[in-house]
Design a protein with these regions (language model features):
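Extended amphipathic alpha-helical segments with heptad-repeat/coiled-coil character used for oligomerization
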Residues: 131-168
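Alpha/propeptide regions of enzymes that mature by internal proteolysis
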Residues: 90-123
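Preference for long, solvent-exposed alpha-helical segments and helix-linker "stalks"
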Residues: 119, 125, 165-168
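A contiguous strand-loop segment
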Residues: 1-91, 124
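Surface-exposed patches in mature extracellular/periplasmic domains of secreted proteins
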Residues: 114, 125-133
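Conserved catalytic-core segments centered on acid/base and nucleophilic motifs
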Residues: 2-4, 73, 102-106, 116-117, ...
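Short, low-complexity, polar/charged sequence segments that are solvent-exposed and flexible
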Residues: 30-34, 92-94, 157-160, 167
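An acidic- and aromatic-residue-enriched active-site/binding cleft used to recognize and process polar
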Residues: 15-17, 77-78, 118, 143, ...
Length: 168
């Protein structure tokens, strides 16, 4: 479960209640550290990101994170429902495991996230044979709004999330 809380400040948190650990750790991607994406090249300039991840081969596989602008994002189980597309021409193709850093590296608000998602394709490229595709849906929030993003068989869907909560 992930939830947001707004008082005079904005808070976002989530539970990661597995019975075992994947080697989770706090991961920090510094501002402007070169970030390579499988189909979208390397971003040389981007926002700083901090979150929980399994780091494999030096790459942070973020479960949840927040960027320096206050946009937070968490991936939660969506088993049996999630489906990712094949790579397509004329759109930005982002692998499922890259989704959190792709969004948080360049969006300063949920409004910017919506714009970025309008020309993005979430694809079925796994990180490696040892790390198959995770079946997830996501909550993305800032101090003004929350959305839920789900990739299913008929494409990417974006829903307003006025309560700022997402469950498995």
């Amino acid at each position: 479960t992930a939830a947001t809380y707004k008082t005079k400040d904005f808070y976002m948190g989530r539970t990661l209640d597995y019975e075992f650990s994947y080697g989770d750790q706090i991961a920090i991607t510094p501002r402007n550290y070169p970030f390579s994406f499988r189909h979208a090249g390397t971003k040389q300039t981007h926002y700083a990101i901090i979150g929980m991840a399994h780091v494999a081969g030096g790459y942070p596989l973020y479960y949840d994170a927040i960027n320096e602008k206050g946009v937070g994002m968490a991936g939660l189980n969506f088993v049996g429902n999630a489906a990712y597309a094949n790579v397509k021409p004329d759109v930005t193709n982002v692998a499922q495991f890259e989704f959190i850093p792709w969004i948080l590296s360049q969006c300063a608000s949920v409004a910017e996230v919506r714009t970025l998602l309008s020309h993005m394709n979430l694809v079925n490229t796994p990180f490696s044979e040892q790390f198959p595709l995770a079946q997830l849906h996501w909550i993305i929030s800032d101090e003004t709004a929350s959305i839920t993003v789900e990739s299913i068989a008929d494409g990417l869907h974006i829903y307003d999330n006025p309560v700022g909560v997402l469950t498995n």
